[in-house]
Each structure stands twice: as structure tokens, then as C-alpha cells.
Amino acid sequence: ITGTNGKTTTVTLLYRLFTTLGYSCGLLSTIANYVGTKGSEAVNTTSDPLTINSLLSEMVNAGCEYCFMEVSSIGVEQERIAGLKFKVGIFSNLTHDHLDYHKTFAEYLRCKKLFFDQLPQDAYAITNMDDRNGMVMVQNTKAKVVTYSLRSIADHTCRIVEQSFEGMLLRMDSRESWTPLIGQHNAYNLLAIHTTAMVLGADEEETLIALSTLRPAPGRLENMRGPKDISVIIDYAHTPDALENVLKTL
């Protein structure tokens, strides 16, 4: 997955989802790297090529069937993922970030788009239609394009039926599912996860049941209950868009 916000939550929950569904999986993320159930600390969102390929080799030897990975714009630009063949590429959203490195938003967008330009023909390019750059990302890809949206007609859709501090009731495509996650941005993350599971051939009912058991990724809108029923929210938000999403949710 690539995008400004939502990468860590999406890959972490995909890893947990497919583990729950009975698959042996790997995870390469901002928070941690996992080979099956064996975890190690991560240094960068997208590690250097030697580290990535070493971990992928460990995953193969451990019998992992899937690896869910965050792909940063810097990682793409520096060719840290060169030579890797992705089965699925997901685009979450694009807002201002890393402009200290890329200098311009156009260059930031170009690096994100390059990830999809390089996907093979037998891959899937999953994109958020509600982001103004969603279709730009996949306009030159050779992969099969699959869309998701909370606002318009798409291959996979979602609507928030109810929400509170305890979670949300979502209508995912034509079926309802409860989740302990909160906030519209998490509805987008869960829809991207659901869409990915569907293109990878997972059973829809089993997927929705498993999604309802998934807790937030560490430091991603975690709701902690304090004394006297006081709620404490822990969140990593460090971009204007991410902070706005958190404050709107609260």
C-alpha cells in the first residue's frame, strides 16, 4: 500500500485479518516487521533493499503465503522496492507530506504513481475513487484496476450506518459489519482491506466476521479507558490531513 495516511493501519489489519483467516503472513510496516508471528523493530516505513529481501527470504522459508507492506514515496524514488513483483497495490489518499524531501507536491505524486506504473499485468491496482488523485494514480498501470468509495459508485462501497466511541456499524457492499475502529478515515481503511481480501479470493462472510474482531493498530486512534470513565485517545497523526481526521472524529 502507498498513500499519505492509512498505510500502517491498513497493512497491520491486513496482516491480522489473513492470520485470523488461517494464512501464515509477513508484515513490513512503520511500526514493526513480522515473519509469521516473530516480530522485530522497524527503522523506516520502507526499509532498504537488503533488509526487505532478507525478511522476504525469511518469510518464504517460514512458509508465509502473503506479505503486507507499506511502500513510501521515498522508498519508491530510491528504488528500495526494485525487483519486487507485487500481486496487489493499494492507494489510500494523497495530501501534503515529505515535501522536505520531494520539494514539490507534483514530485511527491509522481513517486507515488510510479509504484502503480510498475505493477505487472496480472496484479491488481486498488484505488480510492474519493481522493482527487485516485484515478490519476492508476491511469498508466498495466494492472487490473479495482475501485473503492464511500461517496460514489465503485467496485466496492461502504457506508457508515452508526458510530460511537465504541465503534462503527458499516454497510460494506451489501452486508453489515460492526468494527471497534472509529472515524470515517478508518471506514476507508477497512474498505480498502475488504477490497483487498475480495480480490485475493477470501470468503466474504469469513472476512466480515474477522474484520469485526480487529482492534486498532498501535498508536492509531486507540481508545483507552481511564478512571471515572474518562476516555484517552492515542494517535500518531503528524500531517494536516491526519490531524484533521482525528479531530473531526472526536
Give the location of each predicted region.
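Short, conserved glycine- and acidic-residue-centered signature motifs
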Residues: 45-48, 186, 239
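Acidic, Mg2+-coordinating active-site environments of NTP-dependent enzymes
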Residues: 62, 86-232
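Glycine-rich, charged/polar anion/phosphate-binding loops
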Residues: 74-77, 157, 244-247
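AMP-binding/adenylate-forming catalytic core of the ANL superfamily
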Residues: 238-250
